[in-house]
Structure formats: C-alpha cells, structure tokens
Amino acid sequence: MEFSQLVERLQTHIQCHSLEKFGDRNPTLGGVAALTEALTGQISYVDSAKYAPQMKTTQASALILPPDAKLQAEADAQGIAWCATAQPRLLFAAAIAVFYQPYRPPAGIHATAVIDPSVHCGEDVSIGPHVVIYPNVTLGDRVCIHGNVVIYPGVTIGNDSVLHGNCTIHERTQIGQGCVIHSGAAIGAEGFGFVPTPEGWFKMEQSGQVVLEDGVEIGCNSAVDRPAVGETRIGKNTKLDNMVHVAHGCRIGEACALAGQVGLAGGVTIGNRVILAGQVGVADKSEIGDGAIASAQTGIHGKVGPKEVVCGSPHMPHKLYLKASAIYKRLPEMYDTLKKLKKV
C-alpha cells in the first residue's frame, strides 16, 4: 500500500479532517512498528519532541507526526515521508487496524459445539469447538464465539460481539453490540452475598442481572458479578483490563478505563470517563465523579469529586499526597529530632 493511500484510508477510518500528507515522498508500506524497531517499508509515529533523537536513527519509511515544525524538518532531513495530525497516537492506532485484523473464524457452527435447539442465532454467527450454549440464548448478527465458551440460559448477546476462548457468561446477563469478552472472564456470576447467622452464613440468592452496554471490553480473568436484586451495569465503551473485579450492584459510566487488578466492592457508583490505575481498591458504596483519576494502588473510601485526581490510601488529593509523601520520607530524621528536643 502506498503512503498516500494509507493517509486517505486513515482520514476515512476515523473521520479526521486535520490529517495532511506533506511532500512528494510516497513509499510503499507493508506494516507498522515502534519508532526504534521500524524497518524500511513500515510506518511509525512520534507524538512529542522528546522522541526527536530517535528519529535520527529510525529506519521507518513514513511517520505520523504532530504539528511540530522541528519534528517535521527532521523527518525531511532524514528523507522520511510524513503526515501531520494533532493526535498521532490515535492515527497510529488506526494504521495498525489497516495492517492487522484479529483472528476471526469463518461463520458456522463447529461440529463439537453443544447448542440447545431454542437458541436463536443471527446471521453469519461463528461458534467454535466445544462451545456450550444453554436454552433461550439470543445471539445477534456476526457474533463470534471461540472455543470452550459456556453461555448459561437466557443470555442476550448483541451484534458483532466477540467472546474469546474459555470465558463464561452466566444467566441473567445482557451483552450489547460490539463488546469483547477476553479469555477466562466470568460475566454474571453470583455476587458475594451472605447474611450472618448464629450458625455461620445464610446464602442470599443473587437474582439481579448484569448489563454490558455497547462497546464494552472485559479483559482476561476479570469478573463482573450480578447482585441480589437490581443490576450491575457497565456503560458504553468502557474498558476493563485483565483481572479486574466488579462486585454486585456496581454501576460504571461510559468510556471509563479500569487497569489491571482494580477491585470494586459492592454498590460502587462510577461516573463517565473515569480512569482507575492498577490495583486501585474501591470500598463498598463509594461514589466517583465524572472524569476523576485514581493513581495506582489508591484506596478509595467514600466520595471522589468530578475531575478530581486522587492518590494514596485512604485517598487524598494528588497535591496533598505529594506533600505527605515528601514528609513521610523524612519521618526517621524528624523522629530523631523530636527525641533530641525531648531530652532538652
């Protein structure tokens, strides 16, 4: 594919009107690569001036650059074709999609799949080996189910969703369109509901449901539990990394990102476009406002306001955390000083 053809496809793919190709260079491209690993015939990207030194040694034939005159001049000096956009990383992601498409088996049902006669399949559905689908399941058009997936009764899965190998979808679960469930994930399993008694624990049946709205992605070995009553809901385009736990009754808004090993206790409410970094823990019934960010290993108790950035456990504003951390490092010295003052 010629560079000019790729630029045209990228403009169409993400409806970007600010992408421009400059110069007469029009190399043939066959793939994408990181800036330091790219070879002739590959395209890469640069999103800030700190990568300018790497441009001097890259073998990439083309680059996606920001609107930075110095970077663009460096590309010209190196004889590299380039295009400019305000979002180089986004365009690079679109370029990857041009050259690479995830494996998808052809439409059809594998001979070893066990499917109840009551299951409704849309058009061009792909069902892999050893899949088990219980009664009254509805599969939309172009749904792809890889090997060893188990789908419990009454589940609904929307058009173009993909279920990777060895994931399990429990009863009382609705999955929207264009969702991706990765290997080992469990969606709709019973929430952790037990009532203490003199004898131990009385099991509270979990009769609620789980709803994944359109475009949700669930990482490997993650779990989204259903509640005793009501629903656990994950909003449109929200992404969960591997080993994320969403407990019963949580409500997560749209376009959120939860990194690996995040754990939400029951009844947590999260707004839209919230980012939780790795190993963040959120106590039961906590509330997190739109656009909030929690750094890695933050322990959230109570409320986090909209667009607030929090750190530490228990959580505190980012600036306060930095001050507290600086003091914490000096505690031994301060303690020694205090002991000396006591002796005076």
UniProtKB/Swiss-Prot annotation:
Protein's recorded name: UDP-3-O-acylglucosamine N-acyltransferase
Species in which this protein is naturally found: Synechocystis sp. (strain ATCC 27184 / PCC 6803 / Kazusa)
Gene: lpxD
PANTHER family for this protein: UDP-3-O-ACYLGLUCOSAMINE N-ACYLTRANSFERASE, UDP-3-O-ACYLGLUCOSAMINE N-ACYLTRANSFERASE 1, MITOCHONDRIAL-RELATED
UniProt-listed InterPro entries: Hexapep (IPR001451), LpxD (IPR007691), Trimer_LpxA-like_sf (IPR011004), UDP_GlcNAc_AcTrfase_non-rep (IPR020573)
Function, as annotated: Catalyzes the N-acylation of UDP-3-O-acylglucosamine using 3-hydroxyacyl-ACP as the acyl donor. Is involved in the biosynthesis of lipid A, a phosphorylated glycolipid that anchors the lipopolysaccharide to the outer membrane of the cell.
Protein's UniProt keywords contain Mitochondrion: no
This protein's GO CC annotations: carboxysome; membrane
Record EC number: 2.3.1.191
Any one GO molecular-function label of the UniProt entry: N-acyltransferase activity
Pathway: Bacterial outer membrane biogenesis; LPS lipid A biosynthesis
Assembly mode: Homotrimer.
This protein's record includes keyword Transferase: yes
A biological-process GO annotation: lipid A biosynthetic process
Catalysis performed (reactions): a UDP-3-O-[(3R)-3-hydroxyacyl]-alpha-D-glucosamine + a (3R)-hydroxyacyl-[ACP] = a UDP-2-N,3-O-bis[(3R)-3-hydroxyacyl]-alpha-D-glucosamine + holo-[ACP] + H(+)
